[in-house]
């Protein structure tokens, strides 16, 4: 019975392409159009949910701003937006005379999220095409002004949002976020594989909730002695599990703003400086290649 069911499904889908499918495939992928005024686009992604990806995106964006960069932060999680809470930005954005949204700003970071366009208690129930259309609207229907970096916080997994961004926006690179859990690492490997197939550079991995610091003896306590993190692209930083980070998230004040002299602020500054160096090297190599031609 099971074999019959599999064969039936196979016959239903493994058929000759229709004329419309042939025409659609002949068009190829959409041509990536730059976002007006935006120099670099960095995606923050994860395979599993709950690994702290949005926390990393928010504090990374704020750390770039503290370095003097002009920064925007786009919440690409259409179904579960958290940027309004984490950045304490609420209310609908103003629309200018060109029908472009003006992103509100906090902590010197311009922010935009689907959470600003829908009531908190309202869920978004959309299929793929609507999600992809919403992402394009948030990206290109916004007056970002002049930005050095646009950070995009994406939903977990490898779904429509990731594909839409990769196909429509010139992504400079990706930062992957994971915890040391085997399950999280395995799914992050799948995400890395997807971006490699899409020819999007992977800057590295942020390992979150790697350890904690004992409040009594100040000793570093590792949660996972054996981890598969080494199977992922190069590690950028390892972050601790700490109640102050959770407290910062709840209060809408990123930890790098609330505790500017803390170890966490130092680590995120280190991340921002390293990514800035990578961007500078990329630009230098690109200029050299252009000169050679």
Curated annotation (Swiss-Prot):
Gene3D superfamilies of this UniProt entry? P-loop containing nucleotide triphosphate hydrolases
UniProt subunit comment: Homodimer; dimerization is not reliant on iron-sulfur cluster binding.
Provide the family line: Belongs to the Mrp/NBP35 ATP-binding proteins family.
List, separated by semicolons, the cofactors it needs.
[4Fe-4S] cluster
How does the protein associate with the membrane? Answer: Peripheral membrane protein
Q: What is this protein called?
A: Iron-sulfur cluster transfer protein Nubpl
Q: Which InterPro entries match?
A: Mrp-like_CS, Mrp/NBP35_ATP-bd, NUBPL-like, P-loop_NTPase, YlxH/NBP35
Q: List the GO biological process terms.
A: iron-sulfur cluster assembly; mitochondrial respiratory chain complex I assembly
Instruction: Recall the GO molecular function terms of this protein's record.
Output: 4 iron, 4 sulfur cluster binding; ATP binding; ATP-dependent FeS chaperone activity; iron-sulfur cluster binding; metal ion binding; phospholipid binding
């Amino acid at each position: 019975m099971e074999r019959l069911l599999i064969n039936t499904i196979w016959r239903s889908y493994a058929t000759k392409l229709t004329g419309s499918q042939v025409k659609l495939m002949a068009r190829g992928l959409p041509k990536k159009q730059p976002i007006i005024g935006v120099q670099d686009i960095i995606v923050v992604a994860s395979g599993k949910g709950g690994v702290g990806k949005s926390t990393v995106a928010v504090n990374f964006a704020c750390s770039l701003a503290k370095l003097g960069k002009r920064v925007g932060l786009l919440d690409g999680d259409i179904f579960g937006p958290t940027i309004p809470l984490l950045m304490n930005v609420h209310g609908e954005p103003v629309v200018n005379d060109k029908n472009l949204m003006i992103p509100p700003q906090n902590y010197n970071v311009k922010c935009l999220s689907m959470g600003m366009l829908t009531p908190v208690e309202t869920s978004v129930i959309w299929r793929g095409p609507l999600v992809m259309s919403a992402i394009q609207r948030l990206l290109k229907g916004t007056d970002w002004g002049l930005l050095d970096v646009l950070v995009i916080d994406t939903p977990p997994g490898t779904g429509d949002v990731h594909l839409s961004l990769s196909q429509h926006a010139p992504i400079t690179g990706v930062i992957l976020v994971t915890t040391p859990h085997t399950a999280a690492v395995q799914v992050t490997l799948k995400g890395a594989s997807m971006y490699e197939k899409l020819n999007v550079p992977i800057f590295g991995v942020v390992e979150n909730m790697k350890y904690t610091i004992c409040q009594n003896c100040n000793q570093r306590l590792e949660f996972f002695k054996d981890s598969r993190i080494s199977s992922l692209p190069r590690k950028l930083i390892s972050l601790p599990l700490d109640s102050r980070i959770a407290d910062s998230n709840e209060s809408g004040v990123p930890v790098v703003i609330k505790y500017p002299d803390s170890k966490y602020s130092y680590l995120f500054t280190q991340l921002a400086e390293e990514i800035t160096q990578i961007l500078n090297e990329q630009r230098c190599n690109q200029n050299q290649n252009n000169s050679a031609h």
